[in-house]
Amino acid sequence: MHFIIGIVICLSLSVIQSNTSDEGMCMAKEQCTDPEESTTGRSLYSADYNKYFNAIETALAGYVACNSTNCNCHADVLKADLKPFKAHGITKEMINRAKQYGTHYQVIGHKLYRQRECMFPARCSGVEHFVRPLLPLLPDMDLIVNCRDWPQIHRHWSKEKIPVLSFSKTAEYLDIMYPAWAFWEGGPAIALYPTGLGRWDLHRQTITKASADWEAKEPKAFFRGSRTSDERDALVLLSRAQPSLVDAQYTKNQAWKSPQDTLNAEPAREVTLEEHCRYRFLFNFRGVAASFRFKHLFLCRSLVFHVGDEWQEFFYPSLKPWVHYVPVPVRSTPEELEALITFFQEHDQLARAIAERGYEHIWNHLRMADVECYWKKLLKRYGKLIRYTVERDSTLIEV
């Protein structure tokens, strides 16, 4: 596959760089422009196109498929997250300091206990779904599980090592990542999914079934979502200017009060995950933290454009830019987005190859079995770091 893609890249580069004659044509490294050509003309993209070709070629040359055995595709993440505690382990004092940052759980005698009040019951329930089957394998331990959207332990604010489990973080945080509750239940609640997305196992089946053949997909970019941040505005504005290139519109969220909240337009209707599969190019933006939508988009066998690389979930590092998805800088302008989308419209084989690799990776390495495997590895290795005798907290309830 890499050999074939390499041929496509080389042939495409040769077309771009062939304009070297003296008959009014520019040299390869010059900016090829025609005074009568539209400012959005194809020749203005040549520098960007070279950049994209080179990025894809470099990424593929250095790519080594991960080992799917025993969820090892995600092993480096777990190793890095637990590294701060490797030398001296986890002490009772650390747990006491961590309690303010999340929900307190205990595993005692292969039973699970939790503080009575849970800020987000569906999220706690999703966590407990994955922990309960592992109880016969686990030693006694205290766990502080953060079910909020935002990570808690900033590396520059916290001088002490504090073990808090969170589903998502950036490089600025030292939280220990766990597979989110939303693999089972909870997640963003919208009208179409009033109790949250949940049930990754079922979505894997329904979205894949809804995926249209590549040729049948509309060759345009697509996005639906609320205006969580203005990082999404450039794509929406491009859509309004060039609806044949992009269909990107804002939907309502709980804070919506007027069209001003949807960039001075009426909110669009929400669409199911399956409806996304009609389109060849799908954009993913972060929300408050990492996007729950991200993993679902790959199941459409469409090309995923992932905006920003700051926010992570446990499985993100196994996905490689330009190999499995197209990376997009956070503050891209409408013009930059236009160039990127147009490139993949005009280089359909490259787009399809990246889309297929992205689908295969998620399908093969983010099964529910992989999620359960990661939970198992996480809790067993975490348990080995406990350096004190865990005593039952009588204020906790069995769950």
From Swiss-Prot:
UniProt-annotated location(s): Endoplasmic reticulum lumen; Secreted
Site features described as Interaction with the consensus sequence C-X-S-X-[PA]-C in peptide substrates, chain residue numbers: 120, 227, 254
GO cellular component terms, semicolon-separated: endomembrane system; endoplasmic reticulum lumen; extracellular region
Catalytic residues identified in the record: 149
Signal peptide coordinates: 1-18
Enzyme class: transferase
Binding site residues for UDP-alpha-D-glucose: 224-228, 232, 271-273, 289-293
Region (Interaction with the consensus sequence C-X-S-X-[PA]-C in peptide substrates): 189-194
GO-annotated biological processes: positive regulation of Notch signaling pathway; protein O-linked glycosylation; protein O-linked glycosylation via serine
The protein's role, per its UniProt record: Protein O-glucosyltransferase. Catalyzes the reaction that attaches glucose through an O-glycosidic linkage to a conserved serine residue found in the consensus sequence C-X-S-X-[PA]-C in epidermal growth factor-like repeats. Regulates Notch signaling by glucosylating Notch in the ER, glucosylation is required for the correct folding and cleavage of Notch.
Name of this protein: O-glucosyltransferase rumi homolog
Lineage: Eukaryota, Metazoa, Ecdysozoa, Arthropoda, Hexapoda
